[in-house]
């Protein structure tokens, strides 16, 4: 993994916060660049969404946390993120009317994180500037959720060296068994 991408993913303060937000262990489920193009009304992130594929499942505590690292300032002009407060507590998507009356736009300074429950309804705003607005998105989850990126395969294919503490943070210790026999053997050894 490129050190530029690893540094925000392994940020000590973020990891301390995640330990308080997600019960038990957590790992980096996915990481992706989010580029809000200039003068665009056709960008997919402009639609309100949740960041897990389980769109209508909610829990009494977070299953996953989104930590959006602002590479650039997120301003009103360049498409700072909108959130719908408390929408992570309802299985149903909010109505358009509810969104229009409840949404809050959150400007964020470059070099900081916007941290949200992955089930919080959110969207980028239109970027009305001449430059793209860039963020680095991280989804951290409890090990009971399948990773959206298989990190071990990413590293083996690219022959890259694991960063310090990578096994735990990338969830490599949470690999599911490949057979019933392996599952039963793991259970006996606990």
Identify the function of each model-found stretch:
Residues 1, 29, 63-65, 77-79, ...:
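Residues that flank catalytic or metal-binding motifs in active/ligand-binding sites
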Residues 31-33, 86, 118-120:
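Short, well-ordered beta-to-alpha junction loops that form the rim of enzyme active sites
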Residues 31-33, 67-69, 136-140:
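A structural signal for short, well-ordered beta-strand segments
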Residues 9, 84, 116:
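A conserved hydrophobic position in a structured secondary element of the catalytic/binding core
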Residues 39-107, 145-152:
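Catalytic core of non-heme Fe(II) oxygenases with the double-stranded beta-helix
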Residues 90-115, 119-121, 125-190:
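Conserved double-stranded beta-helix
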Residues 1-48, 53-55:
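Non-heme Fe(II)-dependent double-stranded beta-helix
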């Amino acid at each position: 993994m490129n050190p530029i991408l690893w540094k925000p993913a392994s940020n000590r303060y973020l990891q301390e916060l995640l330990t308080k937000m997600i019960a038990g262990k957590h790992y980096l489920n996915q990481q992706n660049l989010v580029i809000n193009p200039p003068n665009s009304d056709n960008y997919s992130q402009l639609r309100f969404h949740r960041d897990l594929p389980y769109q209508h499942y909610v829990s009494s505590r977070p299953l996953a946390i989104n930590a959006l690292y602002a590479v650039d300032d997120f301003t009103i002009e360049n498409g700072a993120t909108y959130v719908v407060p408390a929408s992570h507590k309802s299985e149903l998507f909010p109505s358009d009317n509810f969104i229009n009356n409840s949404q809050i736009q959150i400007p964020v300074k470059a070099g900081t994180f916007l941290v949200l429950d992955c089930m919080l309804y959110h969207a980028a705003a239109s970027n009305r500037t001449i430059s793209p607005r860039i963020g680095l998105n991280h989804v951290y989850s409890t090990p009971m959720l399948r990773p959206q990126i298989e990190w071990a395969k990413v590293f083996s294919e690219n022959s890259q060296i694991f960063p310090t503490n990578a096994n735990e943070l990338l969830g490599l210790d949470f690999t599911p068994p490949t057979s019933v026999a392996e599952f039963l053997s793991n259970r006996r050894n606990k």
